[in-house]
Amino acid sequence: MLDRLQAVENRYEKLNELLSDPAIISDSNKLREYSKEQSDIQETVEVYREYKDVREQLKDAKAMLEDKLDAEMREMVKEEVSELESQDKTLSERLKILLVPKDPNDDKNVIVEVRGAAGGDEAALFAGDLYRMYSRYAEVQGWKTEIIEASYTELGGYKEIIFMINGKGAFAKLKFENGAHRVQRVPETESGGRIHTSTATVAVLPEAEEVEIDIHEKDVRVDTFASSGPGGQSVNTTMSAVRLTHLPTGVVVSCQDEKSQIKNKEKAMKVLRARVYDKFRQEAQAEYDQNRKQAVGTGDRSERIRTYNFPQNRVTDHRIGLTIQKLDQILQGKLDDFINALVMEDQAQKMEAAE
């Protein structure tokens, strides 16, 4: 561990030199890249330096105990040794966590795609519940939510809704929401009072910046069409809706939320860039992890990750076996109990893999 920490400190000092280089300062991409790298490892370096200082003090204090000391002084030194050993242990554990490989996408904004799956109208209504749950969670975090594309049903649900959440650390918190969410409840239209089971799928994609994924104009086919509202009726006689197809990968994105074709194209391009980036990211991750089963969510969107049981006011996350009897509060955006537990499980798994 100490060798890795020393290498991190050496890199931090090298970055300080690079960030003072006029050639780097004049290159905005390099400046941003190195500044972010330095920011990412700064806490690790600061804690490592504190750790080295504590170990040096501990070494000196233990050496003092080898000298001839009066009883009062010996007791004081013993207390100091005990305190320093406690600090040493705390800092050591903290450094282990800081050395856990950080997902480079953690600080990014996210694009969330929620779709009604098995269950027809009830699944579409549940997709709406999930959208509102994430919107309220984002609001509590101080993040901004913006709808990119929505396909409504006549009962007020969503066949599909795609929205962006802008906020630092959004992907770190929401990436574990990938998968199939199951709901068990009595539909309002059910006269017999029978419980129905429906599902909705959630995909969480990190927003890709232009410098990270280069999409050439020649590789994108642009189709325009008239936008439509609930039930398929036309709501705009102009060809304002846009469909983008990334020819090399076959990824397709549509957007008709705005009245302006230009704005719809801008929104669609954000989603296209994120989906293409996510496709490459998933392929690279699958290759890297092909022989190692992850403990927390594989990202497989057909995987049932959570069940929302309305009659029992219960939500269960099947990946970590956590059940909470607060479904009503969770749908109001109080997701911290689940998200924090999933983050901790992920860190523990990565620490184990790193040892």
From Swiss-Prot:
Keyword Protein biosynthesis appears in the UniProt entry: yes
Gene Ontology molecular function terms on file: translation release factor activity, codon specific
Residues that bear N5-methylglutamine: Q233
GO cellular component, one term: cytoplasm
Main subcellular localisation: cytoplasm
Location(s), subcellular: Cytoplasm
Entry keyword set: Cytoplasm, Methylation, Protein biosynthesis
Modification after translation (UniProt): Methylated by PrmC. Methylation increases the termination efficiency of RF1.
Organism domain of life: Bacteria
Matches recorded under Pfam families: PCRF, RF-1
Record family assignment: Belongs to the prokaryotic/mitochondrial release factor family.
Role: Peptide chain release factor 1 directs the termination of translation in response to the peptide chain termination codons UAG and UAA.
Protein name according to UniProt: Peptide chain release factor 1
